[in-house]
Amino acid sequence: MENSSAASASSEAGSSRSQEIEELERFIDSYVLEYQVQGLLTDKTEGDGESQRTQSHISQWTADCREQLDGSCSFSRGRAPPQQNGNKDNSLDMLGTDIWAANTFDSFSGATWDLQPEKLDFTQFHRKVRHTPKQPLPHIDREGCGKGKLEDGDGISLNDIEKVLPTWQGYHPMPHEAEIAHTKKLFRRRRNDRRRQQRPPGGNKPQQHGDHQPGSAKHNRDHQKSYQGGSGPHPSGRPTHHGYSQNRRWHHGNMKHPPGDKGEAGSHRNAKETVTVENPKLEDGPGDTGHSGLEPPCSPDTLTPAASERPTPQLPGGPEAEIKHKDTVLPERLRERPKITLLQSSKDRLRRRLKEKDRDEVAVETSSPQPSKMDRLMEILNIMRNNSSDVDAKLTSFMEEAQNSTNSEEMLGEIVRTIYQKAVSDRSFAFTAAKLCDKMALFMVEGTKFRSLLLNMLQKDFTVREELQQQDVERWLGFITFLCEVFGTMRSSTGEPFRVLVCPIYTCLRELLQSQDVKEDAVLCCSMELQSTGRLLEEQLPEMMTELLASARDKMLCPSESMLTRSLLLEVIELHANSWNPLTPPITQYYNRTIQKLTA
């Protein structure tokens, strides 16, 4: 009995304890569950707050970066705010700010040549303005990254880091840099081609550049009428190979041209490489076959009557070589020289250059829509045109007369138009007209500047230059001449040249070299303008000068060009090789005598 009662009591006690334990566990579980629910809600609320703060911070940072980027890029492109233009129509001013931008460029304001940025971006002449792309930043799931709950596409990939961070557009290579790199690559490729062509198939032997035996193969056929008829080396002792491939440039590989073309191109090669030649050689006339190669033996102009002025140089190889040389030359002397026809304005410029200008032979027309006010001004212009002495005093009197007679914007425009038309129609007057425009640049009537009207006229003719070339060649050449003279003479208030004119001038000079209508006149105009403004143009934009001189070399080496064209282009190339410094008197005399004989 006692045992059974004790067992029942212990079982009741155990069951009561187990019930208490179960109730305690349920109680603890309920609290734990409540705490877990509250904790999750708190974590989620805090996470959302952090995400919102992060997103707002990123958005603000992105906006600030965009503002800085837009501001820096706008001024890095060289454009100033429109408030800098002080003229009344927002397309005219100048001297107060010296801000220029041509409407041939893609500018934001559509300004004319009379607006210039502090740093003109010449690359706008070739490309469009690139705008900075604005990409929103993706949302960053901080909670997912921290708890290992990252889903595909929600995180940041190092490969796509530029999608997250703001992209700086200011250091990307510009298109003009790619063009320059491509041009350099082409130059290197052409140089390698020339070097490969100069290597003989059997190794470098002196016989290739020296003696040409009559019994040799194809090489002898190419050079059988070289400078000594194939009997001896070059009179000047220099190799006769050229550095340009005519087969590649002009497709003359079929041997249908005269066999002296290779000697001709070789002499041009020697002329390009030996700029500093001894003065006695430079004094020789164009009939000297040992000179720099302006006149190849295959041309009818090869032996001009310069042999009568000086004794014939002794040729290597003895009297036999000299007799052979004379036998080769005499039939060519009997040929008639092709006549070179130049425009009257080109002849006038040549006479002025050669100090043979006749000041009384050209009559200047005097047409004025307002005779009462313009007669005196036209008279002063005619005096300056016919008599180039004491120009400064005449310029001063013209300015005083213009200030006294100009009382309206229309009258100022008439004065500018009169000077412009006279300078364009008479190229010999272009330099004097440019000096006059430089002195009157600050002249202003009713808020309109003299310089603004002048540049607007230049810009207008530049836009229609193709029609001008087809309709009136004289006016086309006169416009280019006056444009270059204005660039070389006029200066801003800070003493800087008008950089907005650089690209238009390069364009016009390139078109002169490519002209097929009046070749000699166009090349003469290009040559004389490069001699006067070449240094300044190269300082402003050397890459385009390199391209222009490459075109000049190609044209000079083209067999179809005349002797006058080659002489003018060679003089420019030699002047550039001398860093645009004046050539020595013997070299200058040589070119002057050559031009006189070729244009006689």
UniProtKB/Swiss-Prot annotation:
Give residue spans, biased composition: Basic residues.
Answer: 183-198
Q: Where is the composition biased (Polar residues)?
A: 52-62
Keyword Transferase assigned: no
Q: Which InterPro entries match?
A: ARM-type_fold, MIF4G-like_typ-3, mRNA_TranslReg/HistoneTransl
Q: In which tissues is it expressed?
A: Widely expressed.
Q: Where is the MIF4G domain?
A: 378-579
Please state where this protein is localized: Cytoplasm, Perinuclear region
Q: Subunit structure of this entry? A: Interacts with NCBP1/CBP80; the interaction is direct. Associates with the eukaryotic translation initiation factor 3 (eIF-3) complex.
Tell me the protein's name: CBP80/20-dependent translation initiation factor
Q: Which organism is it from?
A: Mus musculus (Mouse)
UniProt lineage: Eukaryota, Metazoa, Chordata, Craniata, Vertebrata
